[in-house]
Amino acid sequence: MLRNKDRSSNKGNLAVTAVALQDHLLHDLQLGHLSVADPCKIKARKKEKKSKSLKRDATAIIDTGLRKSTEGPNMEDPEKEYVLDPTPPPLTLAQKLGLLPPPPLPLSSDEWERVKQRSLLQGDSIQPCPICKEEFELHPQVLLSCSHVFHRACLQAFEKFTNKKTCPLCRKNQYQTRVIHDGARLFRVKCATRIQAYWRGYIVRKWYRNLRKIIPPSDAKLRRKFFEEKFTEISHRILCSYNTNIDELFSEIDVCLAVNRSILQQLDERCGQIITKEDWEKIQAQAAHHEIYECSICLTPLSFHGDGRQAAIGTSSQRPRETVLLSCAHLFHNACLLALEEFSLGDNAPFHVCPLCRSCYQKKIVEC
């Protein structure tokens, strides 16, 4: 009887041990979908749990019209380090029975400091991310308990793809993660150093350009080129100092042209009328009434008087000088009037004025 009891207890212990080890393997390899339970029942249980959680979290809200005041900005340190998974995973049956060692406890702050120092000695934050092969820059960065460093987004994508919590480098299971900012700090220092280098180079180049503008070179060709540039710069500065208001000049030209057109139009109205033969006869009669016997330009007798009579000629060898009648009823020698018109061509062109009455005229040679 005792032997049978011992055998049955041993068989029960072996069964429990086998089940515990199988459960541990399923949890370790994350093969929950291989459970012997009906998958439809598992899905129904999950739906019931979700509905219960929704019912438990449902609360009635009454809109009173009052709005909560917006909270101020979070004044926490943006570079504060924190652990992402502080709670360890639940123990499996094999770990509870002592068949397998339990998972390690969460690391303390001192242990995290030692892990971080080991990562700094390895230079992981200086090197690119092992998953995406890109610099850390200002992207979120995580440190694993195995002292390896990755992008937070890259590690989450790796865990989602492999469906395991295993380090991509050393394959350590159930690691712990901590958010750090060493890569961002090193990237800021690198950017600041690069900006300072560019700024110093700009200052030195600017100082050297000003120095070249002041001190002439010793070489003859360069010295000649230096003074040519100086002379060009001074000439350009003088030209820029002049006030060349082209629009104002054009406006003045337009005003002058308008005034000249108005004057010419008035003169054309006064002097541009065509005088008929009857009008000339009236003008000649008016000139005879004035009794003009000599040219007012040369003060010599006219060869043809205003009354139509020919003047007496002293000698037969002298030819009579042509007499011209103006539209203002004045008489002159034709040669004298032409000389006067040629002399005063630039003053009253294209119209001429009578030497006596200063009015515009039209002329006609008086026939003997």
From Swiss-Prot:
SMART domains: RING. SUPFAM superfamilies: RING/U-box. Its main location: cytoplasm. It is found in: Cytoplasm. Keywords: Cytoplasm, Metal-binding, Repeat, Zinc, Zinc-finger. Residues 45-82 are annotated as: Disordered. It comes from the Eukaryota. Residues 188-217 form the IQ domain. GO terms for cellular component: aggresome; cytosol; endosome; nuclear body. InterPro entries: IQ_motif_EF-hand-BS, RNF32, Znf-RING_euk, Znf_RING, Znf_RING/FYVE/PHD. GO terms for molecular function: zinc ion binding. A zinc finger (RING-type) spans 129-171, 295-358. No coding region alterations in either Hemimelic extra-toes (Hx) or Hammertoe (Hm) mutant mice was detected. May play a role in sperm formation. This is RING finger protein 32. The gene is Rnf32.
